[in-house]
Amino acid sequence: MAVKASFLAGTGILSVFGDSLDNTITGSRDAAGTILINGGAVAVTGGHPTVANTTLIQVFGQGGNDTITMNEANGALPAANLFGGAGNDTLTGG
Protein backbone atom coordinates (compact mmCIF):
# COMPACT_ATOMS: atom_id res chain seq x y z
CA MET A 1 0.00 0.00 0.00
CA ALA A 2 2.79 2.45 0.87
CA VAL A 3 2.23 5.89 2.39
CA LYS A 4 -0.93 7.78 1.35
CA ALA A 5 -2.14 11.27 2.19
CA SER A 6 -5.43 13.12 1.77
CA PHE A 7 -6.55 16.67 2.51
CA LEU A 8 -10.09 17.72 3.38
CA ALA A 9 -10.26 21.41 2.53
CA GLY A 10 -13.61 21.85 4.31
CA THR A 11 -12.12 20.83 7.65
CA GLY A 12 -8.48 21.76 7.05
CA ILE A 13 -7.33 18.28 8.08
CA LEU A 14 -4.41 16.55 6.37
CA SER A 15 -4.42 12.79 7.07
CA VAL A 16 -1.44 10.56 6.35
CA PHE A 17 -1.52 6.75 6.55
CA GLY A 18 1.29 4.23 6.49
CA ASP A 19 0.81 0.51 5.97
CA SER A 20 1.86 -2.69 7.75
CA LEU A 21 5.50 -2.28 6.69
CA ASP A 22 8.25 -0.19 8.32
CA ASN A 23 7.40 3.33 7.11
CA THR A 24 9.39 6.55 7.31
CA ILE A 25 6.99 9.50 7.20
CA THR A 26 8.20 13.09 7.41
CA GLY A 27 5.93 16.12 7.37
CA SER A 28 7.54 19.43 6.42
CA ARG A 29 6.88 22.61 4.49
CA ASP A 30 8.58 24.60 1.79
CA ALA A 31 9.40 28.31 1.95
CA ALA A 32 6.05 29.20 0.32
CA GLY A 33 4.11 27.31 3.02
CA THR A 34 3.09 24.20 1.08
CA ILE A 35 2.95 21.18 3.38
CA LEU A 36 4.97 18.24 2.06
CA ILE A 37 4.95 14.57 2.97
CA ASN A 38 8.33 12.90 2.50
CA GLY A 39 9.64 15.98 0.72
CA GLY A 40 6.78 15.91 -1.79
CA ALA A 41 7.31 12.26 -2.79
CA VAL A 42 3.85 11.37 -1.41
CA ALA A 43 1.08 12.93 -3.50
CA VAL A 44 -1.74 14.47 -1.45
CA THR A 45 -5.24 13.79 -2.79
CA GLY A 46 -8.21 16.09 -2.26
CA GLY A 47 -6.47 19.43 -2.34
CA HIS A 48 -3.32 21.45 -1.75
CA PRO A 49 -2.45 21.69 1.98
CA THR A 50 -0.64 24.82 3.11
CA VAL A 51 0.16 26.27 6.50
CA ALA A 52 -2.61 28.83 5.85
CA ASN A 53 -5.44 26.37 5.08
CA THR A 54 -4.48 23.38 7.27
CA THR A 55 -5.65 23.26 10.88
CA LEU A 56 -4.41 19.77 11.81
CA ILE A 57 -2.03 17.12 10.50
CA GLN A 58 -2.85 13.55 11.55
CA VAL A 59 -0.31 10.81 10.87
CA PHE A 60 -1.15 7.13 11.39
CA GLY A 61 1.85 4.81 11.06
CA GLN A 62 -0.24 1.64 11.53
CA GLY A 63 1.68 -1.67 11.63
CA GLY A 64 5.44 -2.03 11.37
CA ASN A 65 8.33 -0.22 13.03
CA ASP A 66 7.63 3.30 11.81
CA THR A 67 9.57 6.55 12.06
CA ILE A 68 7.29 9.59 12.01
CA THR A 69 8.79 13.08 12.13
CA MET A 70 7.52 16.65 11.87
CA ASN A 71 10.37 18.77 10.44
CA GLU A 72 9.98 22.51 11.05
CA ALA A 73 13.35 23.55 9.60
CA ASN A 74 11.57 25.75 7.00
CA GLY A 75 9.07 27.22 9.47
CA ALA A 76 6.28 26.26 11.82
CA LEU A 77 3.72 23.61 10.88
CA PRO A 78 0.09 23.37 11.99
CA ALA A 79 -0.74 21.25 15.04
CA ALA A 80 -0.04 17.55 14.50
CA ASN A 81 -1.23 14.30 16.08
CA LEU A 82 1.16 11.39 15.55
CA PHE A 83 -0.06 7.82 16.06
CA GLY A 84 2.48 5.03 15.67
CA GLY A 85 0.13 2.05 15.79
CA ALA A 86 1.40 -1.51 16.24
CA GLY A 87 5.16 -2.01 16.26
CA ASN A 88 8.19 -0.30 17.76
CA ASP A 89 7.76 3.26 16.50
CA THR A 90 9.76 6.48 16.81
CA LEU A 91 7.68 9.68 16.89
CA THR A 92 9.32 13.12 16.76
CA GLY A 93 7.33 16.35 16.89
CA GLY A 94 8.49 19.71 15.56
Annotate each predicted stretch with a short phrase.
Residues M1-G94:
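Acidic, glycine-rich low-complexity segments
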